[in-house]
Amino acid sequence: MITHFRQAIEETLPWLSSFGADPTGGMTRLLYSPEWLETQQQFKKRMAASGLETRFDEVGNLYGRLNGSEYPQEVILSGSHIDTVVNGGNLDGQFGALAAWLAIDWLKTQYGAPLRTVE
């Protein structure tokens, strides 16, 4: 399992970090900036391709949802943010969002639909 997550992170973290990348090795994705909007759209596509229902709320937060089979009205939330400060690092915020998505995808693959809905 650790090997799976290590490989998944090594494949997806550079991809996610490429949006808003700057020449010094950091990235800048200020809230509602073109870089942030592009990242949101690309991350949404990846989540949808993995079988999650995706949506944006009124302020632009992105959700990926896997409906529960027994208690769908009970929702477990996990995640983080993908906006950054100027020249931010690649683990701040986006790593939490990425980790939540990868964990949900792995659990779905291993065990099928969860009893409770996860987002």
Q: Which residues does each predicted region cover?
A:
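N-terminal hydrophobic or amphipathic helices/low-complexity stretches enriched
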Residues: 1-23
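General structural feature for long, well-ordered alpha-helical segments within catalytic domains
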Residues: 5-12, 35, 39, 43, ...
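Structural signal for hydrophobic packing residues in well-ordered secondary-structure cores
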Residues: 13, 17-20, 50-54, 104-111
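N-terminal, well-ordered alpha-helical segments
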Residues: 41-45, 60, 76, 98-105
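Catalytic-core environment of secreted peptidases
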Residues: 50, 62-92
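Alpha-helical metal-binding/catalytic segments enriched in His/Glu/Asp
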Residues: 78, 88-119
